[in-house]
Amino acid sequence: MRRRGGDSFRRAGRRKISNVVWWVLSGIALLLFFLILSKAGHIEPRPSIPKRRYRNDKFVEGMNMTEEMLSPTSVARQVNDQIALAKAFVVIAKESKNLQFAWDLSAQIRNSQLLLSSAATRRSPLTVLESESTIRDMAVLLYQAQQLHYDSATMIMRLKASIQALEEQMSSVSEKSSKYGQIAAEEVPKSLYCLGVRLTTEWFQNLDLQRTLKERSRVDSKLTDNSLYHFCVFSDNIIATSVVVNSTALNSKAPEKVVFHLVTNEINYAAMKAWFAINMDNLRGVTVEVQKFEDFSWLNASYVPVLKQLQDSDTQSYYFSGHNDDGRTPIKFRNPKYLSMLNHLRFYIPEVFPALKKVVFLDDDVVVQKDLSSLFSIDLNKNVNGAVETCMETFHRYHKYLNYSHPLIRSHFDPDACGWAFGMNVFDLVEWRKRNVTGIYHYWQEKNVDRTLWKLGTLPPGLLTFYGLTEALEASWHILGLGYTNVDARVIEKGAVLHFNGNLKPWLKIGIEKYKPLWERYVDYTSPFMQQCNFH
Protein backbone atom coordinates (compact mmCIF):
# COMPACT_ATOMS: atom_id res chain seq x y z
CA MET A 1 0.00 0.00 0.00
CA ARG A 2 1.45 3.34 -1.05
CA ARG A 3 1.83 6.17 1.45
CA ARG A 4 0.68 9.60 0.58
CA GLY A 5 3.24 12.46 0.38
CA GLY A 6 1.12 14.75 2.54
CA ASP A 7 1.35 12.41 5.52
CA SER A 8 5.09 12.36 5.48
CA PHE A 9 5.19 16.14 5.37
CA ARG A 10 2.85 16.37 8.38
CA ARG A 11 5.00 13.94 10.45
CA ALA A 12 8.18 15.97 9.78
CA GLY A 13 6.41 19.16 10.84
CA ARG A 14 5.23 17.64 14.13
CA ARG A 15 8.81 16.49 14.97
CA LYS A 16 10.13 20.02 14.32
CA ILE A 17 7.51 21.60 16.57
CA SER A 18 8.24 19.05 19.33
CA ASN A 19 11.94 19.88 19.28
CA VAL A 20 11.22 23.59 19.53
CA VAL A 21 8.98 23.02 22.56
CA TRP A 22 11.67 21.05 24.32
CA TRP A 23 14.26 23.72 23.62
CA VAL A 24 11.94 26.40 25.00
CA LEU A 25 11.20 24.40 28.15
CA SER A 26 14.92 23.72 28.65
CA GLY A 27 15.67 27.41 28.35
CA ILE A 28 12.99 28.32 30.87
CA ALA A 29 14.38 25.70 33.30
CA LEU A 30 17.88 27.13 32.93
CA LEU A 31 16.59 30.64 33.56
CA LEU A 32 14.77 29.46 36.69
CA PHE A 33 17.92 27.64 37.91
CA PHE A 34 20.12 30.72 37.49
CA LEU A 35 17.49 32.86 39.14
CA ILE A 36 17.44 30.57 42.21
CA LEU A 37 21.23 30.56 42.42
CA SER A 38 21.38 34.32 42.28
CA LYS A 39 18.78 34.58 45.07
CA ALA A 40 20.72 32.13 47.30
CA GLY A 41 24.05 33.96 46.87
CA HIS A 42 22.61 37.32 47.71
CA ILE A 43 22.66 38.08 51.57
CA GLU A 44 20.16 40.65 52.52
CA PRO A 45 21.42 43.14 55.10
CA ARG A 46 19.87 42.57 58.56
CA PRO A 47 18.28 45.45 60.30
CA SER A 48 20.81 47.06 62.69
CA ILE A 49 20.23 46.44 66.42
CA PRO A 50 20.25 49.67 68.32
CA LYS A 51 23.14 49.78 70.82
CA ARG A 52 21.91 49.27 74.38
CA ARG A 53 22.49 52.22 76.61
CA TYR A 54 23.47 51.12 80.12
CA ARG A 55 22.96 53.21 83.22
CA ASN A 56 26.72 53.52 83.62
CA ASP A 57 26.78 55.52 80.37
CA LYS A 58 24.75 58.13 82.13
CA PHE A 59 27.13 58.26 85.14
CA VAL A 60 29.11 61.36 85.46
CA GLU A 61 31.80 62.28 87.89
CA GLY A 62 29.92 62.82 91.16
CA MET A 63 30.15 62.57 94.92
CA ASN A 64 32.80 60.51 96.73
CA MET A 65 30.72 58.84 99.47
CA THR A 66 33.72 58.18 101.71
CA GLU A 67 34.75 61.81 101.68
CA GLU A 68 31.16 62.83 102.27
CA MET A 69 30.90 60.59 105.35
CA LEU A 70 34.14 62.02 106.75
CA SER A 71 33.21 65.63 106.20
CA PRO A 72 32.17 67.24 109.52
CA THR A 73 29.72 69.58 107.76
CA SER A 74 27.89 67.01 105.62
CA VAL A 75 24.36 65.79 106.25
CA ALA A 76 25.51 62.21 105.59
CA ARG A 77 28.01 62.48 108.43
CA GLN A 78 25.25 63.59 110.81
CA VAL A 79 23.00 60.71 109.77
CA ASN A 80 25.84 58.19 110.14
CA ASP A 81 26.72 59.45 113.63
CA GLN A 82 23.10 59.09 114.67
CA ILE A 83 23.10 55.50 113.40
CA ALA A 84 26.24 54.62 115.40
CA LEU A 85 24.82 56.04 118.62
CA ALA A 86 21.44 54.41 118.05
CA LYS A 87 23.05 50.98 117.60
CA ALA A 88 24.70 51.31 121.03
CA PHE A 89 21.36 52.30 122.57
CA VAL A 90 19.69 49.27 120.96
CA VAL A 91 22.07 46.97 122.88
CA ILE A 92 21.42 48.76 126.17
CA ALA A 93 17.65 48.78 125.58
CA LYS A 94 17.67 45.01 125.04
CA GLU A 95 19.73 44.48 128.21
CA SER A 96 17.19 46.65 130.08
CA LYS A 97 14.32 44.51 128.70
CA ASN A 98 12.88 47.56 126.89
CA LEU A 99 12.19 45.61 123.71
CA GLN A 100 9.65 48.06 122.23
CA PHE A 101 12.11 50.93 122.38
CA ALA A 102 14.84 48.70 120.92
CA TRP A 103 12.50 47.85 118.04
CA ASP A 104 11.71 51.56 117.40
CA LEU A 105 15.41 52.37 117.31
CA SER A 106 16.13 49.49 114.93
CA ALA A 107 13.36 50.63 112.57
CA GLN A 108 14.68 54.18 112.51
CA ILE A 109 18.22 52.89 111.93
CA ARG A 110 16.95 51.09 108.82
CA ASN A 111 15.28 54.30 107.57
CA SER A 112 18.51 56.23 108.01
CA GLN A 113 20.50 53.52 106.26
CA LEU A 114 18.08 53.61 103.30
CA LEU A 115 18.58 57.36 103.06
CA LEU A 116 22.35 56.94 102.90
CA SER A 117 21.97 54.13 100.37
CA SER A 118 19.89 56.31 98.03
CA ALA A 119 22.51 59.06 98.16
CA ALA A 120 25.28 56.58 97.38
CA THR A 121 23.30 55.16 94.45
CA ARG A 122 22.66 58.48 92.75
CA ARG A 123 26.12 59.77 93.66
CA SER A 124 24.94 63.09 94.94
CA PRO A 125 25.06 64.53 98.47
CA LEU A 126 22.13 64.35 100.82
CA THR A 127 20.23 67.58 101.09
CA VAL A 128 18.81 69.05 104.26
CA LEU A 129 15.35 69.04 102.76
CA GLU A 130 15.19 65.31 101.98
CA SER A 131 16.86 64.19 105.21
CA GLU A 132 15.25 66.60 107.65
CA SER A 133 12.40 64.32 108.70
CA THR A 134 14.67 61.28 109.13
CA ILE A 135 17.17 63.22 111.23
CA ARG A 136 14.37 64.72 113.34
CA ASP A 137 12.75 61.32 114.01
CA MET A 138 16.08 59.80 115.02
CA ALA A 139 16.88 62.80 117.24
CA VAL A 140 13.59 62.29 119.09
CA LEU A 141 14.46 58.66 119.80
CA LEU A 142 17.98 59.55 120.94
CA TYR A 143 16.52 62.15 123.29
CA GLN A 144 14.20 59.51 124.71
CA ALA A 145 17.22 57.27 125.24
CA GLN A 146 18.90 59.99 127.28
CA GLN A 147 15.74 60.38 129.34
CA LEU A 148 15.94 56.65 130.00
CA HIS A 149 19.53 57.21 131.24
CA TYR A 150 21.10 55.62 128.19
CA ASP A 151 23.68 58.41 128.07
CA SER A 152 27.47 57.88 127.90
CA ALA A 153 28.08 57.93 131.65
CA THR A 154 25.42 55.30 132.23
CA MET A 155 26.79 53.24 129.38
CA ILE A 156 30.26 53.33 130.91
CA MET A 157 28.93 52.24 134.30
CA ARG A 158 26.98 49.40 132.73
CA LEU A 159 29.99 48.29 130.71
CA LYS A 160 32.19 48.36 133.81
CA ALA A 161 29.67 46.23 135.66
CA SER A 162 29.53 43.78 132.75
CA ILE A 163 33.32 43.58 132.59
CA GLN A 164 33.55 42.99 136.33
CA ALA A 165 30.95 40.22 136.13
CA LEU A 166 32.83 38.59 133.26
CA GLU A 167 36.12 38.83 135.16
CA GLU A 168 34.56 37.16 138.19
CA GLN A 169 33.12 34.45 135.99
CA MET A 170 36.48 33.92 134.28
CA SER A 171 38.24 33.78 137.66
CA SER A 172 35.77 31.15 138.87
CA VAL A 173 36.23 29.05 135.73
CA SER A 174 40.01 29.40 135.96
CA GLU A 175 39.99 28.29 139.59
CA LYS A 176 37.85 25.26 138.76
CA SER A 177 40.14 24.40 135.86
CA SER A 178 43.16 24.62 138.14
CA LYS A 179 41.52 22.37 140.73
CA TYR A 180 40.46 19.75 138.21
CA GLY A 181 43.89 19.86 136.57
CA GLN A 182 45.56 19.37 139.95
CA ILE A 183 43.27 16.43 140.74
CA ALA A 184 44.02 14.85 137.35
CA ALA A 185 47.76 15.28 137.91
CA GLU A 186 47.65 13.70 141.37
CA GLU A 187 45.49 10.76 140.34
CA VAL A 188 47.25 7.40 139.96
CA PRO A 189 46.27 5.93 136.57
CA LYS A 190 44.47 2.60 136.80
CA SER A 191 47.08 0.93 134.58
CA LEU A 192 49.91 2.07 136.86
CA TYR A 193 48.10 0.76 139.93
CA CYS A 194 47.49 -2.55 138.11
CA LEU A 195 51.19 -2.84 137.24
CA GLY A 196 52.21 -2.36 140.86
CA VAL A 197 49.80 -5.05 142.05
CA ARG A 198 50.87 -7.61 139.42
CA LEU A 199 54.59 -7.01 139.99
CA THR A 200 54.17 -7.29 143.76
CA THR A 201 52.34 -10.58 143.31
CA GLU A 202 55.07 -11.81 140.97
CA TRP A 203 57.78 -10.87 143.47
CA PHE A 204 56.30 -12.85 146.33
CA GLN A 205 55.38 -15.84 144.17
CA ASN A 206 58.68 -16.09 142.30
CA LEU A 207 61.33 -17.17 144.80
CA ASP A 208 63.92 -17.58 142.05
CA LEU A 209 63.54 -13.89 141.21
CA GLN A 210 64.19 -12.91 144.82
CA ARG A 211 67.19 -15.21 145.08
CA THR A 212 68.75 -13.88 141.88
CA LEU A 213 68.47 -10.25 142.97
CA LYS A 214 69.86 -10.96 146.44
CA GLU A 215 72.88 -12.79 145.07
CA ARG A 216 73.58 -10.05 142.57
CA SER A 217 73.37 -7.23 145.14
CA ARG A 218 75.43 -9.11 147.72
CA VAL A 219 78.50 -9.43 145.52
CA ASP A 220 78.14 -6.15 143.62
CA SER A 221 81.05 -3.93 144.65
CA LYS A 222 80.02 -1.29 142.12
CA LEU A 223 77.55 0.24 144.58
CA THR A 224 80.34 2.00 146.49
CA ASP A 225 82.95 2.39 143.73
CA ASN A 226 83.57 6.15 143.34
CA SER A 227 85.28 5.69 139.98
CA LEU A 228 81.88 4.88 138.47
CA TYR A 229 78.94 7.13 137.54
CA HIS A 230 76.38 7.12 140.35
CA PHE A 231 72.81 8.32 139.79
CA CYS A 232 70.00 8.45 142.35
CA VAL A 233 66.22 8.55 141.84
CA PHE A 234 63.64 8.80 144.65
CA SER A 235 60.23 7.69 143.38
CA ASP A 236 57.15 5.53 143.86
CA ASN A 237 56.37 5.48 140.12
CA ILE A 238 57.65 2.27 138.53
CA ILE A 239 57.16 3.21 134.88
CA ALA A 240 58.60 6.71 135.28
CA THR A 241 61.66 5.33 137.08
CA SER A 242 62.15 2.64 134.43
CA VAL A 243 62.16 5.33 131.71
CA VAL A 244 64.86 7.28 133.56
CA VAL A 245 67.02 4.17 133.86
CA ASN A 246 66.35 2.90 130.31
CA SER A 247 67.04 6.25 128.66
CA THR A 248 70.27 6.70 130.61
CA ALA A 249 71.44 3.18 129.76
CA LEU A 250 70.63 3.42 126.05
CA ASN A 251 72.37 6.78 125.63
CA SER A 252 75.42 6.02 127.76
CA LYS A 253 78.80 5.52 126.09
CA ALA A 254 79.87 3.23 128.94
CA PRO A 255 76.71 1.68 130.46
CA GLU A 256 78.74 -0.85 132.44
CA LYS A 257 80.05 2.10 134.53
CA VAL A 258 76.58 3.42 135.32
CA VAL A 259 75.11 2.69 138.76
CA PHE A 260 71.52 3.60 139.68
CA HIS A 261 70.48 3.94 143.32
CA LEU A 262 66.68 3.84 143.54
CA VAL A 263 64.78 4.64 146.72
CA THR A 264 61.03 4.05 146.98
CA ASN A 265 58.48 3.43 149.73
CA GLU A 266 57.26 0.26 151.42
CA ILE A 267 54.19 -0.05 149.19
CA ASN A 268 56.12 -0.08 145.92
CA TYR A 269 59.32 -1.72 147.14
CA ALA A 270 58.52 -5.28 146.00
CA ALA A 271 57.10 -4.14 142.66
CA MET A 272 60.14 -1.96 141.94
CA LYS A 273 62.53 -4.81 142.74
CA ALA A 274 60.51 -7.24 140.61
CA TRP A 275 60.51 -4.92 137.58
CA PHE A 276 64.27 -4.36 137.53
CA ALA A 277 65.05 -7.98 138.36
CA ILE A 278 62.96 -9.09 135.37
CA ASN A 279 64.35 -6.45 132.99
CA MET A 280 67.97 -6.40 134.15
CA ASP A 281 69.23 -8.04 130.95
CA ASN A 282 67.85 -5.15 128.86
CA LEU A 283 69.89 -2.47 130.65
CA ARG A 284 73.20 -3.00 128.79
CA GLY A 285 75.14 -3.79 131.97
CA VAL A 286 73.81 -0.93 134.13
CA THR A 287 73.80 -1.72 137.86
CA VAL A 288 70.55 -1.02 139.75
CA GLU A 289 70.07 -0.93 143.52
CA VAL A 290 66.58 -0.65 145.04
CA GLN A 291 65.97 0.51 148.64
CA LYS A 292 63.02 1.77 150.67
CA PHE A 293 63.29 4.82 152.91
CA GLU A 294 61.48 3.06 155.77
CA ASP A 295 64.70 1.07 156.30
CA PHE A 296 66.69 4.22 157.16
CA SER A 297 66.69 4.17 160.96
CA TRP A 298 68.04 7.73 161.20
CA LEU A 299 64.98 9.03 159.30
CA ASN A 300 62.74 9.87 162.27
CA ALA A 301 60.85 12.79 163.78
CA SER A 302 63.62 13.66 166.20
CA TYR A 303 66.01 14.32 163.30
CA VAL A 304 63.80 15.31 160.36
CA PRO A 305 61.75 18.55 160.72
CA VAL A 306 59.20 17.49 158.11
CA LEU A 307 58.36 14.33 160.06
CA LYS A 308 58.12 16.39 163.23
CA GLN A 309 55.72 18.81 161.53
CA LEU A 310 53.55 15.91 160.41
CA GLN A 311 52.85 15.22 164.09
CA ASP A 312 51.53 18.78 164.54
CA SER A 313 47.73 19.06 164.53
CA ASP A 314 47.73 22.36 162.61
CA THR A 315 49.87 20.85 159.87
CA GLN A 316 47.66 17.79 159.68
CA SER A 317 44.57 19.98 159.43
CA TYR A 318 46.15 22.16 156.73
CA TYR A 319 47.07 19.26 154.45
CA PHE A 320 44.56 16.54 155.28
CA SER A 321 41.34 18.06 156.68
CA GLY A 322 39.80 18.82 153.30
CA HIS A 323 38.62 22.30 154.37
CA ASN A 324 39.05 24.84 151.60
CA ASP A 325 40.29 27.69 153.85
CA ASP A 326 37.68 29.97 152.22
CA GLY A 327 39.72 29.81 149.04
CA ARG A 328 42.61 31.82 150.52
CA THR A 329 45.16 29.10 149.80
CA PRO A 330 45.36 27.57 146.31
CA ILE A 331 44.78 23.83 146.19
CA LYS A 332 48.29 23.13 144.88
CA PHE A 333 49.79 24.54 148.10
CA ARG A 334 47.81 22.04 150.18
CA ASN A 335 49.00 18.93 148.35
CA PRO A 336 50.24 16.36 150.91
CA LYS A 337 52.87 15.12 148.43
CA TYR A 338 55.04 18.07 149.48
CA LEU A 339 55.40 16.41 152.87
CA SER A 340 56.37 13.07 151.31
CA MET A 341 59.80 11.86 152.37
CA LEU A 342 60.49 10.81 148.79
CA ASN A 343 60.40 14.52 147.95
CA HIS A 344 62.51 15.65 150.91
CA LEU A 345 65.01 12.78 150.71
CA ARG A 346 67.11 14.87 148.28
CA PHE A 347 68.30 16.90 151.29
CA TYR A 348 69.68 13.73 152.93
CA ILE A 349 71.71 12.24 150.07
CA PRO A 350 74.99 12.03 152.07
CA GLU A 351 73.19 10.02 154.75
CA VAL A 352 71.50 7.77 152.19
CA PHE A 353 74.80 7.05 150.40
CA PRO A 354 77.53 7.49 153.01
CA ALA A 355 80.27 5.89 150.88
CA LEU A 356 79.78 8.07 147.78
CA LYS A 357 81.60 11.30 146.91
CA LYS A 358 79.61 12.57 143.92
CA VAL A 359 76.17 11.72 142.57
CA VAL A 360 73.82 13.00 139.89
CA PHE A 361 70.28 13.42 141.18
CA LEU A 362 67.47 12.82 138.65
CA ASP A 363 63.75 13.38 139.12
CA ASP A 364 61.45 10.58 137.94
CA ASP A 365 59.80 12.83 135.32
CA VAL A 366 62.91 13.25 133.17
CA VAL A 367 64.17 11.58 130.01
CA VAL A 368 67.88 11.29 129.29
CA GLN A 369 68.79 11.59 125.61
CA LYS A 370 72.59 12.09 125.74
CA ASP A 371 75.56 10.58 127.55
CA LEU A 372 75.87 12.09 131.04
CA SER A 373 79.34 10.88 132.00
CA SER A 374 80.82 14.37 131.46
CA LEU A 375 78.80 15.66 134.41
CA PHE A 376 81.08 13.79 136.79
CA SER A 377 84.17 15.65 135.56
CA ILE A 378 82.69 19.16 135.87
CA ASP A 379 84.53 21.34 138.38
CA LEU A 380 81.98 22.75 140.82
CA ASN A 381 84.58 25.20 142.25
CA LYS A 382 84.07 24.07 145.85
CA ASN A 383 80.31 24.42 145.50
CA VAL A 384 77.90 21.68 146.57
CA ASN A 385 75.23 21.83 143.89
CA GLY A 386 75.65 21.97 140.12
CA ALA A 387 72.39 23.08 138.48
CA VAL A 388 71.00 24.86 135.43
CA GLU A 389 69.85 28.37 136.26
CA THR A 390 66.35 29.48 135.29
CA CYS A 391 66.59 33.27 135.59
CA MET A 392 66.18 34.16 131.93
CA GLU A 393 62.96 35.83 133.11
CA THR A 394 62.08 37.57 136.38
CA PHE A 395 59.51 34.81 136.94
CA HIS A 396 62.33 32.49 138.11
CA ARG A 397 64.16 34.74 140.55
CA TYR A 398 64.13 34.32 144.31
CA HIS A 399 61.32 36.81 144.93
CA LYS A 400 58.97 34.51 143.00
CA TYR A 401 59.38 31.62 145.44
CA LEU A 402 59.95 33.30 148.81
CA ASN A 403 58.04 35.71 151.03
CA TYR A 404 60.14 38.88 151.06
CA SER A 405 57.73 40.61 153.42
CA HIS A 406 59.24 38.39 156.12
CA PRO A 407 62.29 40.07 157.73
CA LEU A 408 64.22 36.81 157.94
CA ILE A 409 64.04 36.32 154.18
CA ARG A 410 64.54 39.99 153.37
CA SER A 411 67.70 40.25 155.47
CA HIS A 412 69.44 37.13 154.14
CA PHE A 413 68.63 36.75 150.44
CA ASP A 414 68.80 38.91 147.34
CA PRO A 415 65.31 38.98 145.78
CA ASP A 416 66.83 39.18 142.29
CA ALA A 417 69.15 36.22 142.84
CA CYS A 418 68.96 33.66 140.06
CA GLY A 419 66.79 30.63 140.62
CA TRP A 420 67.72 27.15 139.46
CA ALA A 421 65.95 23.84 139.00
CA PHE A 422 65.80 20.50 140.75
CA GLY A 423 65.51 17.53 138.40
CA MET A 424 69.09 17.15 137.20
CA ASN A 425 71.66 18.15 139.79
CA VAL A 426 75.30 17.25 140.37
CA PHE A 427 76.03 17.01 144.10
CA ASP A 428 79.53 17.07 145.57
CA LEU A 429 78.90 15.03 148.72
CA VAL A 430 82.35 15.75 150.16
CA GLU A 431 81.66 19.50 150.18
CA TRP A 432 78.11 18.80 151.33
CA ARG A 433 79.33 17.06 154.46
CA LYS A 434 82.04 19.63 155.05
CA ARG A 435 79.57 22.55 154.96
CA ASN A 436 76.78 20.69 156.82
CA VAL A 437 74.24 21.51 154.13
CA THR A 438 71.62 19.23 155.67
CA GLY A 439 71.88 21.28 158.87
CA ILE A 440 71.20 24.46 156.86
CA TYR A 441 68.11 22.80 155.41
CA HIS A 442 66.92 21.82 158.89
CA TYR A 443 67.32 25.42 160.10
CA TRP A 444 65.10 26.89 157.37
CA GLN A 445 62.56 24.06 157.52
CA GLU A 446 62.07 24.67 161.25
CA LYS A 447 61.70 28.42 160.67
CA ASN A 448 58.89 27.72 158.22
CA VAL A 449 56.76 25.65 160.56
CA ASP A 450 53.94 28.21 160.18
CA ARG A 451 54.44 28.38 156.38
CA THR A 452 55.26 32.10 156.38
CA LEU A 453 58.60 31.88 154.53
CA TRP A 454 57.31 29.89 151.57
CA LYS A 455 54.21 27.91 150.67
CA LEU A 456 54.98 25.23 148.15
CA GLY A 457 57.29 22.31 147.50
CA THR A 458 60.96 21.52 147.90
CA LEU A 459 62.45 24.14 145.57
CA PRO A 460 62.07 27.13 147.97
CA PRO A 461 63.92 25.37 150.83
CA GLY A 462 66.43 24.20 148.22
CA LEU A 463 67.05 27.79 147.11
CA LEU A 464 67.66 28.77 150.74
CA THR A 465 69.79 25.73 151.55
CA PHE A 466 72.10 25.99 148.53
CA TYR A 467 72.26 29.81 148.44
CA GLY A 468 75.85 30.69 147.57
CA LEU A 469 76.68 26.99 147.14
CA THR A 470 75.42 26.44 143.58
CA GLU A 471 77.52 26.27 140.42
CA ALA A 472 75.70 27.18 137.20
CA LEU A 473 75.77 24.49 134.50
CA GLU A 474 75.42 24.97 130.77
CA ALA A 475 71.72 25.28 129.89
CA SER A 476 71.59 22.33 127.47
CA TRP A 477 72.22 19.88 130.30
CA HIS A 478 68.68 20.34 131.63
CA ILE A 479 65.69 21.39 129.49
CA LEU A 480 62.62 22.29 131.53
CA GLY A 481 58.96 22.90 130.82
CA LEU A 482 57.77 19.87 128.83
CA GLY A 483 54.99 19.29 131.37
CA TYR A 484 53.31 22.67 131.14
CA THR A 485 54.48 24.82 128.21
CA ASN A 486 55.82 24.89 124.66
CA VAL A 487 59.55 24.38 124.24
CA ASP A 488 61.54 25.17 121.11
CA ALA A 489 62.20 21.98 119.10
CA ARG A 490 65.83 23.00 118.54
CA VAL A 491 66.35 23.38 122.28
CA ILE A 492 64.82 19.95 122.89
CA GLU A 493 67.06 18.36 120.27
CA LYS A 494 70.21 19.74 121.93
CA GLY A 495 69.12 18.91 125.48
CA ALA A 496 70.81 16.18 127.48
CA VAL A 497 68.02 15.79 130.05
CA LEU A 498 64.40 16.66 129.22
CA HIS A 499 62.24 17.49 132.23
CA PHE A 500 58.46 17.07 132.18
CA ASN A 501 57.99 19.35 135.18
CA GLY A 502 54.43 20.54 135.63
CA ASN A 503 51.08 18.77 135.86
CA LEU A 504 51.01 17.42 132.30
CA LYS A 505 53.10 14.31 132.86
CA PRO A 506 53.68 12.06 129.83
CA TRP A 507 52.16 8.99 131.50
CA LEU A 508 48.87 10.84 132.10
CA LYS A 509 46.08 11.37 129.59
CA ILE A 510 46.41 15.12 130.10
CA GLY A 511 50.06 15.07 129.00
CA ILE A 512 51.11 17.25 126.06
CA GLU A 513 50.69 14.97 123.04
CA LYS A 514 53.58 16.30 120.95
CA TYR A 515 56.07 15.59 123.77
CA LYS A 516 54.82 12.12 124.73
CA PRO A 517 56.87 10.30 122.03
CA LEU A 518 60.09 11.63 123.61
CA TRP A 519 59.16 9.69 126.75
CA GLU A 520 57.31 6.71 125.26
CA ARG A 521 60.26 5.57 123.14
CA TYR A 522 61.86 4.30 126.36
CA VAL A 523 58.77 2.43 127.61
CA ASP A 524 58.84 -1.34 127.10
CA TYR A 525 55.31 -1.94 125.83
CA THR A 526 56.23 -5.53 124.92
CA SER A 527 56.40 -6.53 128.59
CA PRO A 528 53.64 -9.03 129.49
CA PHE A 529 52.92 -7.04 132.65
CA MET A 530 52.44 -3.86 130.61
CA GLN A 531 50.09 -5.63 128.21
CA GLN A 532 48.09 -7.21 131.03
CA CYS A 533 47.55 -3.75 132.54
CA ASN A 534 46.50 -2.20 129.23
CA PHE A 535 49.42 0.19 128.79
CA HIS A 536 49.38 1.70 125.31
Swiss-Prot record:
It comes from the Eukaryota. Residues 1-16 are cytoplasmic. One of its GO terms (cellular component) is endosome. Pathway: Glycan metabolism; pectin biosynthesis. The keyword Transcription does not apply. The chain crosses the membrane at residues 17-37. Disruption phenotype: No obvious phenotype. Reduced galacturonic acid content in cell wall. Residues 38-536 are lumenal. Keywords: Cell wall biogenesis/degradation, Glycoprotein, Glycosyltransferase, Golgi apparatus, Membrane, Signal-anchor, Transferase, Transmembrane, Transmembrane helix. It is found in: Golgi apparatus membrane. This is Probable galacturonosyltransferase 10. It comes from Arabidopsis thaliana. The gene is GAUT10.
